[in-house]
Amino acid sequence: MLMPKKVKYRKQQRGRMRGKAWRGSELSFGDFGLKVLEPGWISDRQIEASRVAMTRFIKRGGKIWIRLFPDKPVTKKPAETRMGKGKGAPDHWVAVVRPGKILFEMEGVSVTDAAEAMRLAAHKLPLRTKFVARETSAH
């Protein structure tokens, strides 16, 4: 699973997700991408499940870039614990995404294969997404 090697603070507040993504909203590396359409959290396990689904479909055909990283700790209190007594221990890591963020990029495969691989990856994610392709300009 993806997670930071070292963090300054073990626990974080939940925070708010307002506005659209203004960074990471354009294709940078590949020719095809998966863009998220709504705000939310994507866990390290969901990112890994999406990556595995895509790589299994395209086999050794193309290259995949993961454009998000889970850097926010989510805490959890043990089961059947009374309220109070402080914040729970860090349980897993999530990536905070806002609408417009490119999650994955891909190159070296056909449009149909890329679209199918991204569709398989999107099924593993909790948010609505859309397939995007690079516009090939002739100037």
Curated annotation (Swiss-Prot):
Part of the 50S ribosomal subunit. PANTHER family: 50S/60S RIBOSOMAL PROTEIN L16, LARGE RIBOSOMAL SUBUNIT PROTEIN UL16M. Keywords: Ribonucleoprotein, Ribosomal protein, RNA-binding, rRNA-binding, tRNA-binding. This is Large ribosomal subunit protein uL16. One of its GO terms (biological process) is translation. Gene3D superfamilies: Ribosomal protein L10e/L16. GO terms for cellular component: cytosolic large ribosomal subunit. The gene is rplP. Belongs to the universal ribosomal protein uL16 family. It holds the Pfam family Ribosomal_L16. InterPro entries: Ribosomal_uL16, Ribosomal_uL16_bact-type, Ribosomal_uL16_CS, Ribosomal_uL16_dom, Ribosomal_uL16_sf. Binds 23S rRNA and is also seen to make contacts with the A and possibly P site tRNAs. CDD domains: Ribosomal_L16_L10e. SUPFAM superfamilies: Ribosomal protein L16p/L10e. One of its GO terms (molecular function) is structural constituent of ribosome.
